[in-house]
Amino acid sequence: MKCLVALFLSLSLVACQYDDYDTERKNNNMLSSMNILDLLDSFGLNIKARIAHVRRVAGRIRLTLDIGLGNGDVERESEEAEGEGTDGRGGGEGEREGWGGEREGGEGEREGGEGEREGREGEREGKSSESNESPEDFIGPPVDMCAGESRRGSPSIGCIAAECCQHSFYINSLCPGSSVCCFSMDVCDRLPVPVIPPFPTDPGTLPPPPPIPDSQTTVSPNQPSSYMCHGDFMKLMPKGADQRTARQDNLAYAGVRASNKLVDNDLAELNKRKDCYVQAGKNHCIHPAVIAAIASRETRGGKLLYSTNGYGDGGRAYGIMQCDGGASGLGDICKKYPWDSCEHINQLTDIILLNYVNQMKTKHPSWPAHYQLKGGVSAYNAGVGNVQTIAGMDAGTTNDDYSNDVIARAQRLVNAHGW
C-alpha cells in the first residue's frame, strides 16, 4: 500500500513539473516572438534611415543640376534613387508619411537654391548698373538706315514724307514711322526746324527761328512762291511722249525718256528767250519751265518758224506759242506782237494758258491743283471741253499725249537744266 501511495505521489510530481515546463515553454515562445517583432521593427527603422539619407543626397543633386542643366536628367536620377529605397523599405503607411516629409524637405531645399540663383542674378545686374556704359551703347538699330543708301545709281536724300518724293522713287522700310527713304528729290522742300542749343547761356542771344511756310504755299526746289498759284507740276507723274511724237527726232523709244531727249534738243533755242519765259511766269504765277515746254512741243522753241516767218500748222497758227486765231476766236489778236517776242510769249500765257487753267478749276473743282494745271495744258491743244477725266485728259489731243509730254519736258528743264 505504501508503495502505491509513493508511486502516485511521484507521478503527480512529474505531471506538475511537466505542466510547469509546458507553461515556461509557451512563455519562452511568446517572448521569442516579441523579440523577433522588435528586431524587425528595428531593422525597418534602419531601412528608413538609409532611405532618408538617399533622399537627401538626391535632393541636393537635383538642386545643383536644376540650376545648371535643367530638370529632365535630375528627375530620372531622383526616381532611380527612390526605386532603390523602395526595394528595401516595403509599403507601410507610416513609411509613406516619412517619404512625404522628406519630399517636402527636398522641395524646401530646391526653393532655397532658386533663391540663391535669383540672388546671383541680382548681383550680376547690380554690377551691370555700376558700369559707366549704358545699354544703348550695345543694342539698338542704326540712327539712320537711309543715309548712304543708293538705288539704281541714285543716292538717297534722306527720310521724307512719301508724297514729297518725286516719281515715288523710294523705299519705305528704312525710315521710322510713315516716312520713306527717297532717291529722287523732295518736291515739298519744307524748311528745316531750327536747331536750338539744349542749354543756352543767354536765350536772348538766339536768332529768331525762320518762318514755317503754310502747307498750301510749300514750294518745290527751284519753284519760287510766285510760280505756285496753280499747283506744283513737279508732283505730277507724266507718261511722256507717244511714239508718234518721238518720231520727230527719229527716236526709237517713247515715254519720259523721249520727252527728255526732245526738250534737250530744243534747249539752245529755249535758252535764247529764257528771260521771256521767266518774266511771263512771274507775271501770271506759272512756272517758266511749263511755258517753255509748251513752246518746245508747239514749235521746237521757234526752230520751225524761221523759214515761215512765224507761221505754223499750215499757216493757221502764229508765233512761238502757236496762237490759232480761228480755233481760239482771237482772230488778229494772235498777231499783235512779233512771233518771237517776249510780248507774244506773255500774251499767249495770259489769254490762253492761264485762261484754260482757271476754267479747269471751275469745271473740275474737286481735282487737286496740280491736276487742274495739267488739264489747262491739255486744253491748250484740244480745248476745255475735251478734258473729262484725270486719267484720260489727253485722249483727243495731238498724238493723245499732249499734257503728258509737255509736263515731262518741263520737269526735265527743272531737274537737268536748272530752270
Curated annotation (Swiss-Prot):
Its GO biological process terms? peptidoglycan catabolic process
The main location class comes to secreted
Q: Which residues form a coiled coil?
A: none
| Keywords annotated in UniProt | Secreted, Signal
What tissues contain this protein?
Answer: Component of the acid-insoluble organic matrix of calcified layers of the shell (at protein level).
Q: Which residues form the signal peptide?
A: 1-16
Subcellular compartments:
Secreted
Name it: Glycine, glutamate and proline-rich protein
Which organism is this entry from?
A: Lottia gigantea (Giant owl limpet)
